[in-house]
């Protein structure tokens, strides 16, 4: 990181594959969001329900029902300060000392760092560059132990940009089903999909498997 900063200071163009910030690449807030913020700024409150504002949770719930999630209610929704806070809260609740979580490789480092902070162990499964960075299903199976608690799926993936097919997601869900694991779905970029591809929500594909998205 320090070396990259030094290179930038010398005018060298550094391509950042670690930056999970679409705003750096020209993606801005939609005008509808900006207008709503400006219109309601005087109604802002310093604190609300610990899970987030009820109106916002209702809208989020409706959005995910429209994406195919079943059985979700507004009380199931927690609004966090980005994926970072969500991951910290989730892993602190889910894993303890020595527990393992399966993470894709390459992976957004937030997840492995939080696993370590919780006393857990990140175990990386391979995403094959020769196969458009898709998860290696057999490698996932081989990494499961009696300490495995969950499988993380980052889709669309950060940093590779891969968008997983329904077949790949169903295969991962089946592994979680067979081994009684929790599915963790980092889908923060679900609408940042290009090239005619379509994002599929793994929670919608496997409603019988515990999933946090």
Protein language model features and the residues they cover:
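N-terminal small-domain helix-loop-helix segment of the aminotransferase-like
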Residues: 1-82, 89
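Helix C-cap/helix->beta junction micro-motif
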Residues: 10, 118, 178-179, 209
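Conserved PLP-anchoring active-site segment centered on the Schiff-base-forming lysine
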Residues: 93-115
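A short helix-loop-beta submotif of the ANL/AMP-binding
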Residues: 117-123
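Active-site phosphate-binding strand-loop segment of PLP-dependent enzymes
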Residues: 123, 128-199, 203
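Active-site PLP attachment segment
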Residues: 204-213
């Amino acid at each position: 990181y320090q070396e990259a900063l030094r290179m930038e200071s010398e005018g060298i163009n550094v391509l950042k594959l670690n930056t999970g910030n679409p705003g750096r690449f020209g993606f801005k807030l939609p005008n509808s969001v900006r207008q709503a913020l400006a219109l309601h700024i005087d109604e802002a409150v310093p604190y609300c329900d610990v899970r987030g504002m009820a109106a916002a949770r209702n809208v989020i719930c409706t959005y995910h029902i429209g994406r195919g999630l079943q059985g979700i209610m507004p009380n199931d929704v927690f609004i966090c300060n980005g994926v970072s806070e969500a991951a910290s809260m989730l892993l602190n609740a889910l894993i303890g000392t020595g527990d393992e979580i399966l993470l894709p490789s390459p992976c957004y480092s937030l997840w492995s760092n939080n696993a370590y902070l919780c006393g857990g162990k990140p175990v990386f499964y391979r995403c094959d560059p020769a196969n458009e960075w898709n998860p290696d299903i057999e490698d996932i199976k081989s990494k499961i132990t009696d300490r495995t608690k969950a499988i993380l799926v980052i889709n669309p993936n950060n940093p590779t940009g891969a968008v997983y097919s329904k077949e790949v997601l169903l295969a991962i869900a089946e592994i979680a089903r067979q081994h009684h694991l929790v599915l963790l779905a980092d889908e923060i970029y679900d609408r940042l999909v290009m090239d005619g591809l379509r994002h599929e929500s793994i929670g919608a594909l496997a409603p019988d498997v515990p999933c946090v998205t």
